[in-house]
Structures are given as C-alpha cells and as structure tokens.
Amino acid sequence: MEGHGPQKSSPLARDLTRAFNGYHKQTVLLKKNLKETHAFFREMRQNYSNTCASSTLSSDSASLETSQFSCISFPSHEEEFLRNTVGAAPYILVLGQDCAARYQLLNCLLGERLLPLGPQAGHACHGGQGSTCKRRKLCFTHGKQTRLSLALPGQYELVHQLVANCGRWDTVPREDLEILDECEDPAHRQAELEITLHHPMLQEAKVMVVPCPSVQPIEEAIEDCTRSAIPIVLYAVNQDSLSSEQVADLWKVKEILSFPICFVRLPNLSEDSSEPGQRFEKDKSKLQKQLLSHGLLTCPMGNCSCGAPTQMPTPGAKPQSVLGENFERLHRILVPFTRQVLQNQQVEAASLLNGLHCRCLDLFINQAFDMQRDLQITPRRLEYTREKEGELFTSLMAIANRKQEEMKDMIVETLGSMKEQLLEDAANLEFTDIIVTTNGDPVTSKEIKSCIHQIQDLIVVRLNQAVANKLISSVDYLRESFVGTLERCLDSLEKSHIESSVHNITSNHLKQLLNAAYHVEVTFHSGSSVTRLFWEQIKQIIHRITFVNPPAITPEWKRKVAQDAIESLSAAKLARSICSQFRTRLNSSHEAFAASLRQLEERHTGRLERTEDLWLRVRKDHAPRLARLSLESRSLRDVLLHGKPKLGRELGRGQYGVVYLCDNWGGHYPCALKSVVPPDDKHWNDLALEFHYTRTLPKHERLVDLHGSVIDHTYAGGSSIAVLLIMERLHRDLYTGLKAGLSLQERLQIALDVVEGIRFLHNQGLLHRDIKLKNVLLDKQNRAKITDLGFCKPEAMMSGSIVGTPIHMAPELFTGKYDNSVDVYAFGILFWYLCAGSVKLPEAFEKCSSKDQLWNNVKKGARPERLPCFDEECWQLMEACWNGDPSQRPLLGIVEPSLQSMMVRLCCGSEQKSSSLEDSS
C-alpha cells in the first residue's frame, strides 16, 4: 500500500473522528483554564510571601496573615487527577477473543481491509497440531506516508527488513504480524509493529491491538494506556460465549484501567450471509446473560432494531459497559459510548476545577467580609474601650470624693453596732504565745504590750471586714457594668493583633492594671500585703494606752483595753485615709491604662492599613480574576453535559445583552437565554462575579432560576466571545403587566413577592441594587420573581460604584457609600407604580430632561407625587421607604407584614375602599 493522500473513511470512522475532534477542542480550553489557575495560585503565593518578607511584622503576625491564603492552592490528590486527565490523549484499545476477532474489528474501525482475515490470516490463535499464535502488538499512528516498522515500546526503532517494505501491499503481510519460532533475538520478540497511516481518525487518536496472550500478558500489553491516556476499550466477540480465561483477563483489564468496555458481537466470517441475523437473535441473549452474570455488564437493557441502546445515559452519569449486538449498525452504539467516555473525563476535570474555583472564591468573599468588619469594628472597639474606661474612672473618683463623709458615718455606725460584740469578744479572747494564769496574775510589761496589740488586732480585723464589705457593695454595680465589658472588648482587640512576646507582656500588664485598679475589693478580702499596709495606718491612729504598773490579765482588763481602743479610733481620719488611697490607686491605674491603650492603638493602626490594602486587592483583583476562571470552568462543564443552546427569537434587549427564546436546554423547558458580549476585562470580571453570586444562591421561588452558562467562542463569526446565560423563562415583565392591566390584589401580591425576594437576597448577604419594573418578571398566575442580578453584590465586595436605574436610585448611591437600604428605596418607587397601576412616570421625574438633572433633583429631595387614588397607609409606606435618611427607612421585615395587612384590608375587608385604586389601573 502506497500513497500520500488521506485514506477514505467509513461513516463509523468519520463519526469517531468528529467525537475525538470535539474532545480535543474542549481539551484546549481545559488546559488553558488549568494553566491560568496554576499561574493565579503561584502569583498569590509569591505576592503574600513577598508582602510578609518586606513587612515590619513579626514572624508570628506574618504567618497569621499568610495563613489566610494558604488554602488558595490545589489539594495534592486533585492536582494529580487533573495532571493525568487534562490533555490526556484518547487511545482506542482493541481487545478480543482471538486475533481474528481483533483484526476484524480493527478493519471495521478504519473502514478498510488492512489486516488479514480468514485464510489470509493463517492458523487460528488456538490452532491444531499444538500450534500457538504469536502475533505482535500493533500500534496505529498518523503520518503523511504509509509505513511499517518494528520498535521497542518507548525506546527505539529496530533495523529489520519487513515483508511489507519489499513491495506493494493492500493488507499487512501475515509474516510481519507474527513472531517466528526461530527468532531468538529478545528485542525482536518484544518489539511492536508500528503502522503509520494517513487516516483522519488517527490524527485524533492512536489505536492499539493487543498481542496474543502467549506473546505478552494482557496486564503488560495495556500498560501504555495507564499513563496520560483515555482508553476507549473495545472487546471483539466472535464466539457464542467467553471462556473462563477470557473472563479473568477482562477483570484484570477493568481493575487496571477502571474504564467501561464496549463489547462488540462480530459475525462469523464462515457463516452463510443469509443466516447471521437469525443466529445473532439466538446467541445474543446467551452472551448478554453471561456478561451480566459475571458483572461485566450492569444494565440488562439491550439494543433496539436500529442498533442503538434502548436506554440513553443520563447527562453526567458515569459511563457503563455496553454490548453492541448488531455489527452492521455498530456506529449507533460505539460512537455514543466513545463520546460518553471522553465527556465523562472532561466533565470530572471541569467539575473538579470549578469546585476548587468556587471554594477559593467563597474564601475570598468571606475574608472580604471579615476584613471589612475588622476595618469597621476595631476603631469602634478602641474608642469604646477609651470611653468606658473614662466613665468608670470618673464614676469611681466621684465615689471616692463623695463617700468620705458617708464612710465616716458608716464607720461610726459600724463601731456603734459592733461595740458590745467587740467588747465581749475581747473579754473572751485567748491570747497566743502568752501564758496567763487562771487568776489573772500580773505578767511582764512585754507580755502586757503583746496582749494589748492582740486586742487591737481583733478590733482592726473586725472593723476591716465590716467597712470593706460596705465599700464593696457601693462600687459593685460599677464592676458589673464596666469592667466585664472592658475586659471582653480588650480581649478581642488583643486577639485581633497577635504580635511578639513584648506585646503579649504589655497586654497582660494592661489586664493586671485593670484588675489592680478596679477589683479593689479583692485586696480587702485577701490577707495580702496591700491589706496589711492599708490597715497598718489604722493601727497607728489608735492612741497608745499608758500604764505604770503591769495590771492583772482579767476579762475586765481585756474589756477595758478594748473600750479604750475603740474610743481612741477617729472615724474621720479612717475615712480620709481610705478615700485618699482609693484616689491614688485610681489615678495611677488610669494613667497606665491610657498609655497601654495608646500603644495598642498604634499597633492596630499599622495592621488596619495593611488589612485595607489587602481588602482592596481582594475586591478589585483577586476575586474578579478567580471568578472569571470559575465562569469558564463551569461553562465548559455545562456545554459538555448539555451542549450549546439553540437561540430562538429575540425577546428583548437591555444595556448589557440580548435575551432570546431557548426552547430546551439541560432538561429545562422553556428557557430564556441572555447573550452578553463583555467589551473588556472589567465587564468580564463583573459578569463572572454576578454569575458566581447567582449560581451559588439556593433556589428560591421569588428569584428567577439560572440553569447554566455557555461561553460561545464562535459568536459573530468568531470575532468576539459571548457568554450565554440560560435561565428560567417567565410569561412577561412587570412593566408589560402593568400596561396590560392588573387587579389591586394582584399588584399587592406582586409587592409582597418582591419584598420576599429582596429579603432573601439580603439574608444571603447580597444587595440587588437595580430593583425596577423590567427586573420583576411575572408567571402566568402573575406571581413575581426578581431577575437580572447584574448589579448584585455582597456588601463587603462593593467598591462604591454608581450603578442602577436613575429613577429607582437612592440618593446615597451617588456618594458611593451605601448599604442594603438602597433596595428598600428602590422598592418604594416600585410600590408607587404598583399602587398607581400604570407605567406613567411621576411628574417630578417626567420634567427632567437628562439623567444629571434627575440625579440632582433626587439628591435635593424630589420624589413621586401622591395620586388621588392612593390609600393613606400605602402612601405612608412609600414615603417611609424612600426616606432620604437611610437609617429611617423601614426594615423589610416590617414592610412585609404591613403589606399583608393592607392586602387583607383593601382586598378582603372592604370592596368600597379599594374601588378607587382599582379604577387607576
């Protein structure tokens, strides 16, 4: 066989070529997405390692900041799967019961009699007279010229004279296929026959025919298919059933490759051509039962008369082994089988990539929330700590100043109430370290002095306890209301800025100062050095008791000593001493606290500057880039599973795209298709983030479902790229509905539906930012759903851009600083239209000749006018919703029950009250 032109292809080969070609086109996109994902992760690691290296942060703080992005990477098992799958080459692996079956199937695949069959092939694989078939492994590859060569797998080509190279041939000579018995060269015996053909299918996939089992075990023969290849495993059956050895070999193949097998029942070449159909009908059930019984087939369904499977696989389902029983219509089962095997690998890779993108993107968004909260709450915490400590200090100083007179009276009162008990306790006091006789004989002066001190100590200790308890109760409420909150706030500030050990010592010292300053009552209870020092001054105030002769130690003497000691105490001096020490401690602790707080604030200022810089990078660069990769991987998965949607008639046009009818896609019917052509990277990124927010939302009956997306690289003849967003199709939009006329009950129900949808978005942390008539769609029952989440973003991801439709835009939108109350404002304007029952512009807006004039008027307070038909409660709700002060707008949790009560009152309670509103529509 010679020639330079491409060989003719059979219908089967052409269909397989198209399947392989489609696989390669999608592989290019998968490779690109994977490469860009790797580059993105690599850049993230480099950026944050450089940031931490150049920062003045300590190692602990740097590692903390870096750890926020440590999970922005491939898990090892996912990376290995993608490396082996993305870009893996399709490889047709031809197995069979014997060489004749394998060769017959190969000829069918290529559409020509390339390998010898029948008498040309020589003796069978298990021939008589003890002969054994020794046919080589065959590898078919693409080349401009047809040639045969012997080569060691993965090594080098052998210099060997082949019969095919000696002249013209149409069928590969049998001598080149076999290993001769007299051949003793091990390299020659192990070599495989490489057949290069200029065949279209071989441009897309290699083909391998396994050798006879006597030449090489099956597990060694298919080893090449385990590395960076997607094997399309075909098994040719030309006998009534499989032998036990063949079943065992098939199980080895399934264990090694983990891919499904397409069993192909071949007609027997020796049979009369008029009988095969009848013979197949008799044999196929036997073969099918055997394959099912051995677990080599899982689905008992066979083929219909056209040769196709009676049951088509579900999109995305794992491919299963199949049996093709009608050889003439083999393409009906082999082509879908091939497509499903190839598609399954790409769907798994795209799904894994998209899962990684979504996980990392959610991490970015969550961290944006955390960083935004940190930027907002840390300055407030510092200010709160400073204010509360100041209030506590002022309150305690006020107590110290005003309590002196109260404390004097308290001490006098305490002494008065305790005097008799103190005198009794003193009379019964048992002295320590002094031996007193029973009759109270006089002792030495030194012992007398010790006895007097012990009596004084008794009085001081009892008085200490009583006065301390009274003082504690007077400031106890301050400890509960100030110190606990201060400590919790301080603890959160410390945890948000974990730095070096020096900072830890400073923080711990700050806590100790707080405890020492404001938990004064602890020192009263404990017998600490502070207590001894504090009450030593009280003992000094007691006048010394003078005596000339040592007295007798009797209960009366003890009572007299105690009496003199109590009378010698000065309540005024005691009160003054207590308050003075209290003030001194307060001042020193207050100054130390203020100094430590200033130090902590300085450290937080530097950290917050870095956090704000990181927050900006996450919002403006990291998240949008990753969202685009996520959109691409998800769109690739969707097009692999469901194909490219067919565009129907145009339904409408908007600022950013065209909406078409789409009859059926991905099992959804009917659908609407929004075609968007992003003009630049910014619009690409915005669209990608919109898609991510919408796709990750749980399904909700008040939001239009987004079914999927497809990126069309052939849009406008390939001159631009369009993103096709496939979504639920509804009956009409609210603008059209109001023009056609809606009853009051329907309009109020629409208002309730819209509020329910907005509340759901807000609960998910999203702002819609473009609530208007055109973005509310109605079904056939006139129930509303919100659509077009093009401006929908989490609050933490907003950059302050001015977006929306001018009439529905809240005044603060023009400043770039706003929150979810902008949706409440927009609902107020929408509710005006619903109550009016028409689409006519309010007078205040109709007079404006330009957007700028409209914006200026809105900022100055221009709002829609009250129409005569408006109910008072409806008008009050509108006014509250479009209040110029965002903080004064009602929460949607209040708006919803208000609307429900209006609906009951106006639609169910009194037909007379609602008649004016009905007339307005």
Curated annotation (Swiss-Prot):
Catalytic activity entry: L-seryl-[protein] + ATP = O-phospho-L-seryl-[protein] + ADP + H(+); L-threonyl-[protein] + ATP = O-phospho-L-threonyl-[protein] + ADP + H(+); L-tyrosyl-[protein] + ATP = O-phospho-L-tyrosyl-[protein] + ADP + H(+)
Organism domain of life: Eukaryota
This enzyme's EC code(s): 2.7.12.1
Family matches, as SUPFAM superfamilies: Protein kinase-like (PK-like) (SSF56112)
Keyword terms, alphabetized: ATP-binding, Cell junction, Cell membrane, Cytoplasm, Developmental protein, Kinase, Membrane, Nucleotide-binding, Serine/threonine-protein kinase, Transferase, Tyrosine-protein kinase
Gene Ontology BP terms: cellular response to fibroblast growth factor stimulus; embryonic organ development; negative regulation of apoptotic process; positive regulation of ERK1 and ERK2 cascade; positive regulation of fibroblast growth factor receptor signaling pathway
Compartment(s) of residence: Cytoplasm; Cell membrane; Apical cell membrane; Basolateral cell membrane
Active-site residues per Swiss-Prot or TrEMBL entry: 770
Residues the record lists as binding ATP: 651-659, 674
GO cellular component: anchoring junction; apical plasma membrane; basolateral plasma membrane; cytoplasm
Record's signal peptide: none
Limits of the Protein kinase domain: 645-899
PANTHER family linked to this entry: DUAL SERINE/THREONINE AND TYROSINE PROTEIN KINASE, DUAL SERINE_THREONINE AND TYROSINE PROTEIN KINASE
Function, in words: May act as a positive regulator of ERK phosphorylation downstream of fibroblast growth factor-receptor activation. May induce both caspase-dependent apoptosis and caspase-independent cell death. May play a role in the embryonic development.
Stated name of the protein: Dual serine/threonine and tyrosine protein kinase
